[in-house]
């Protein structure tokens, strides 16, 4: 649902959120599309550094020594600013001890991410030493590091007043004239504060009877030299940018607000502040804060801030990146706003807010303001009145400062509106630099880091921004944590969880023609007519000869012949009725594809079988009128560039053969089909013949085997004996009695085969068991057992023998049985038993 409502919601809020006619600008005009997309595989001129540590989020560039100092988790690195990946780097291992990690884990902290020494602060302390602070497993420590030897000292300083305990908390810090100015959440209780340490007069914000800071997350701080060329002898000031809970937008007391709405703020303190003498002792006497508005009510969370021209206060301005408020958790969008220092100064010189006890709400203070003005720095005018420092200020002024830290007016962006609203993007950090072009004008060039590892390079043009390119700087998606620009090295350094990458500030060689070079509108790039190439302005001796058009991006190449070689003519031939694709890739995301037929007829999507897509032109159901010369043009910013040229020929389709007369039913089968049928029938006949022969052969073999075996018969019992089924064993002839046996076999079936005769009549009781056989037969063999043993897998059952048909003589039964048993020893097992097993 949100995916469908989001464009409409953004458009409505963009046009109506902030009053004023200048803010009724459609969101589609503010949502700039990057002109070029450079994936990770197409990066050129980059350098990488990755050590054994993680979270390379703290960067310090020292241009004079050409060193890039990096603070990571458990380590510090000193890299060559010229090439961070040259391998000639120095490293300091600064890990938290196992005992400290164990204590951190026992306090309920995560031993996978939090219980380490995350280096959060790294600045130049003096000409010989650096100053670094780390979380040290929720026991912060700081150290002065020898810059030349790049080694840790033997002793450390406690860092609980200088560094956050939690590595995930916002932090910003500066070293100014030896004093350490930091803003973060201090101590284990995570108390937000702005503090000054390593100074004869340590200061912090007020906590009672009201908090000057409410659940603040700090983003950025900067020193502005307002004392330079000041006609009133003003003091230098430190500006802090952060997001906090807004107490003025809901009912609440001094100590607790009932509102959870978070807003962006800007605060300032004077560098020469010494605190109060009796009131606000060791507290800031110059602290003031104001709301920072970019685009309400959506964009309230401050993500990144950069300052330009901070050395000259009259030209100092800031760029800030905002994301959606915390209640919009399912949407991603960012806004970029610009703020002038003069506007911030005007707000701090305006009316104050006051907590009104009667209504228990914050409102505009309407009473009188004491003198000297509360929150102001000591100037020449105040010195002439005897106020040489903040400790000389009257108690009335200090009491007013204590209760009125918030200004009534908000700080609005330049021209009252954002420069950019970007959907589906979350900016995490930004930096910028002013670039003076060969023609004279100066443009602000910004580099915006995203939460998924991309860098947007943009130039500020009046009330908007033009995104020159978007570059994927990491193969894996990860957040950009820090950005630093080196003008001497012409490089951008990117800090991220996995490492540091060095990018060139410009990639002018990507643009191959004059039009492509000026359409990019990169302040660093211009077309050189002498070398017929797009070159960086910093590398050209005669910079005035370069062709540039940053404002409009379409002028300067009219008289130049460096429009690039025309594309070769490609031929395509297709049959009538077929489809054909004419490829054409647009190099710019801002270009519109334009197709012309025979140089004049423009083709649109859906017209006469044409389909215009991002990858080319599709001609469907080609007809003879589709033949001709096709040109693919890129139309961008009023310029037209030929990208591809085709000559298409549509050939007539081959006529189909005339259908034959229908064949008769008897002749409808093709000759080859008949032949297959005949062969199949012949094969089946042959198989049947082979099968019949095999069966006949097997039958003959079995008949022969039966003739050689002894014959068994199943005789019918005497009718007088009853109708029960009886089995009789008829012994075969003994050797020497073949003739007699044959005669008997010819005379009746009872003596030659085994018969099963079903019983008839009523069932009769079983006959009495036969008398036991004698101990020894007449042939000298002992009586057979009542059950024969299993031999060679065949079972033999001794059947009751009748007195009839028992052959006399010593060899009638015993010899026959011995011969059968001897034969069975050498008989192969069969799967199915036959009558020979009985």
Curated annotation (Swiss-Prot):
Gene3D superfamilies: Immunoglobulins, ligand-binding face of the semaphorins, domain 2, YVTN repeat-like/Quinoprotein amine dehydrogenase. Disulfide bonds join 104-115, 133-142, 270-377, 294-337, 508-525, 517-534, 584-632. Residues 1-17 form the signal peptide. Residues 507-558 form the PSI domain. The chain crosses the membrane at residues 676-696. Glycans are attached at residues 55, 111, 126, 388, 542, 598. Belongs to the semaphorin family. This is Semaphorin-4G. The lineage of its organism: Eukaryota, Metazoa, Chordata, Craniata, Vertebrata. The gene is SEMA4G.
């Amino acid at each position: 649902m949100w995916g469908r409502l989001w464009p409409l919601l953004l458009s409505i809020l963009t046009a109506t959120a902030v009053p004023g006619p200048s803010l009724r600008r459609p969101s589609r005009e503010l949502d700039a599309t990057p002109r070029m997309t450079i994936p990770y595989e197409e990066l050129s001129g980059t350098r990488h550094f990755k050590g054994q540590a993680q979270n390379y989020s703290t960067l310090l560039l020292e241009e004079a020594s050409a060193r890039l100092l990096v603070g990571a988790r458990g380590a510090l690195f000193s890299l060559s600013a010229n090439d961070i990946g040259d391998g000639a780097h120095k490293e300091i291992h600064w890990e938290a001890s196992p005992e400290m990690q164990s204590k951190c884990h026992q306090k309920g902290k995560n031993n996978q991410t939090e219980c380490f020494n995350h280096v959060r602060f790294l600045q130049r302390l003096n000409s010989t030493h650096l100053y670094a602070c780390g979380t040290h497993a929720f026991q912060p420590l700081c150290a002065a590091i020898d810059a030349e030897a790049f080694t840790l000292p033997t002793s450390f300083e406690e860092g609980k007043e200088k560094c956050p305990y939690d590595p995930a908390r916002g932090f910003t810090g500066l070293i100014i004239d030896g004093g350490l100015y930091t803003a973060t959440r201090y101590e284990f209780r995570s108390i937000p504060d702005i503090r000054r340490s390593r100074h004869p007069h340590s200061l912090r914000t007020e906590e009672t009877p009201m908090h000057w800071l409410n659940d603040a997350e700090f983003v950025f701080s900067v020193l502005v030299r307002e004392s330079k060329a000041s006609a009133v002898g003003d003091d230098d000031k430190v500006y802090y940018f952060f997001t906090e809970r807004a107490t003025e937008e809901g009912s609440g007391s001094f100590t607790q607000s009932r509102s959870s709405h978070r807003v962006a703020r800007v605060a300032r303190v004077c560098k020469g502040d010494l605190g109060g003498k009796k009131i606000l002792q060791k507290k800031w006497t110059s602290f003031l804060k104001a709301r920072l508005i970019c685009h309400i009510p959506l964009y309230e969370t401050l993500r990144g801030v950069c300052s330009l021209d901070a050395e000259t206060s009259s030209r100092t301005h800031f760029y800030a990146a905002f994301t959606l408020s915390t209640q919009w958790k399912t949407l991603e969008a960012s806004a970029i706003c610009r703020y002038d220092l003069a506007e911030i100064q005007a707000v701090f010189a305006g009316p104050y807010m006051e907590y009104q006890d009667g209504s228990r709400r914050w409102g505009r203070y309407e009473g009188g303001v004491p003198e000297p003005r509360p929150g102001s720095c000591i100037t020449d005018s105040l010195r002439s009145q005897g106020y040489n420092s903040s400790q000389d200020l009257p108690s009335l002024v200090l009491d007013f400062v204590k209760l009125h830290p918030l200004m009534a007016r908000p700080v609005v962006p330049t021209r009252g509106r954002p420069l950019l609203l970007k959907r589906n993007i979350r900016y995490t950090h930004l930096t910028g630099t002013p670039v003076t072009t060969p023609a004279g004008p100066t443009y602000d060039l910004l580099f915006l880091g995203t939460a998924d590892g991309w860098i947007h390079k943009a130039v500020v043009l009046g009330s908007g921004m033009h995104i020159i390119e978007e570059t994927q700087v990491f193969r894996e998606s990860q957040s950009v944590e820090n950005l630093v620009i080196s003008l001497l090295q012409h490089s951008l350094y990117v800090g991220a969880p996995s490492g540091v990458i060095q990018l060139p500030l410009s990639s002018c060689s990507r643009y191959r023609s004059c039009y492509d070079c000026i359409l990019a509108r990169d302040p660093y790039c211009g077309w050189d007519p002498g070398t017929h190439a797009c070159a960086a302005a910093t590398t050209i001796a005669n910079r005035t000869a370069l062709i540039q058009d940053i404002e409009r991006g379409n002028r300067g190449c009219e008289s130049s012949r460096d429009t690039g070689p025309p594309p070769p003519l490609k031929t395509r031939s297709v049959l009538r009725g077929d489809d054909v694709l004419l490829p054409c890739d647009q190099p710019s995301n801002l270009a519109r594809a334009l197709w012309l037929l025979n140089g004049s007829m423009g083709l649109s999507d859906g017209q006469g079988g044409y389909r215009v897509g991002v990858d080319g032109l599709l001609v469907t159901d080609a007809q003879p009128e589709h033949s001709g010369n096709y040109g693919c043009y890129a139309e961008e910013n009023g310029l037209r560039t030929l990208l591809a040229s085709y000559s298409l020929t549509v050939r007539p389709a081959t006529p189909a053969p005339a259908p034959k007369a229908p064949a008769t039913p008897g002749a409808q089968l093709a000759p080859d089909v008949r032949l297959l049928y005949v062969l199949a029938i012949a094969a089946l006949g042959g198989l049947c013949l082979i099968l019949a022969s095999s069966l006949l052969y097997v039958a003959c073999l079995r008949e022969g085997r039966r003739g050689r075996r002894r014959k068994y018969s199943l005789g019918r019992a005497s009718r007088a004996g009853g109708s029960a089924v009886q089995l009789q064993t008829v012994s075969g002839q003994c050797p020497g009695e073949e003739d007699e046996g044959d005669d008997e076999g010819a005379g009746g079936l009872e003596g030659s085969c085994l018969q099963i005769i079903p019983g008839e009549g009523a069932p009769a009781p079983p006959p009495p068991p036969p008398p036991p056989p004698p101990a020894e037969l007449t042939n000298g063999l002992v009586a057979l057992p009542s059950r024969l043993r299993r031999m060679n897998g065949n079972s033999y059952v001794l059947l009751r023998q009748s007195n009839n048909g028992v052959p006399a003589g010593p060899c009638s039964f015993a010899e026959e049985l011995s011969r059968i048993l001897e034969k069975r020893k050498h008989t192969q097992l069969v799967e199915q038993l036959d009558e020979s097993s009985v």
